[in-house]
Design a protein with these regions (language model features):
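Structural beta-alpha unit
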Residues: 1-4, 28, 71, 82-121, ...
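Small/aliphatic-rich secondary-structure junction motif
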Residues: 2-67, 87-91, 96
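Short, glycine/charged-enriched secondary-structure capping and boundary segments
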Residues: 24-26, 57-60, 113-114, 135-145
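Gly/Pro- and small hydrophobic-enriched strand-loop and loop-to-helix capping segments
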Residues: 37-41, 160-167
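Primary recognition of RNase H-like, Mg2+-dependent phosphodiesterase/nuclease domains
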Residues: 50, 103, 134-136
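A short acidic, glycine-rich active-site loop
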Residues: 63-79
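Glycine-rich, Arg-bearing micro-motifs that act as flexible, cationic patches
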Residues: 120-153, 167-168
Length: 168
């Protein structure tokens, strides 16, 4: 069981292989052989998109579709949580908390860091990167990834776990 002095690690998960790999990597590198006294309190966070963010706010018929979209998003969240629990169990890690919070993953993960006073945030990398502004004088990301956003906004160390590329 985690002690009062144990630092907190937040791991962001979604339904991607990159997220699964990041959780497995984290457990292998930080929690292997430490089932009695884990080095971190582990908090696994899944950001469930809001139905309106998936459907969009306008358009005919959007209101009728929202309950179906919400139902699907809840099912996806349940699968993500179940998979995370299975991964933890397979690695003999039993002392962890899983949270599902509705909202944008970028904000949810940064808020989880604050809420839990986390010293480290672990996220997977999809490898898309940020789409930069066309203006050469600007270094502002117009659109960016969750990992990029968290690296710049989370008030803790951010570890971005990238799956090794397969050799052809």
């Amino acid at each position: 069981m985690a002690t009062a002095e144990t630092q907190t690690m937040v791991v962001g998960i979604d339904d991607s292989e990159h997220s699964t790999y990041a959780l497995q990597w984290t457990l292998d590198h930080f929690f292997a052989n430490s089932t009695v006294n884990p080095p971190f309190k582990l908090v696994i966070v899944h950001a469930k998109p809001s139905p309106s963010s998936v459907v969009g706010l306008a358009g005919p018929g959007a209101a009728e579709v929202l309950p179906y979209v919400d139902s699907d998003l809840k099912k996806i969240a349940a699968r993500v949580v179940e998979k995370a629990k299975e991964i933890c169990s397979s690695k003999s890690v039993h002392d962890f908390v899983v949270e599902v919070v509705e909202g944008d993953a970028r904000n949810i993960l940064c808020e989880a860091v604050e809420k839990h006073h986390a010293s480290i945030l672990v996220v997977g990398s999809h490898g898309y990167g940020a789409i930069k502004s066309c203006n050469e004088d600007s270094n502002v990301a117009v659109l960016g990834s969750v990992s990029d956003y968290c690296a710049h906004h989370a008030h803790c160390t951010v570890m971005i776990v990238k799956r090794p590329k397969t050799k052809h």
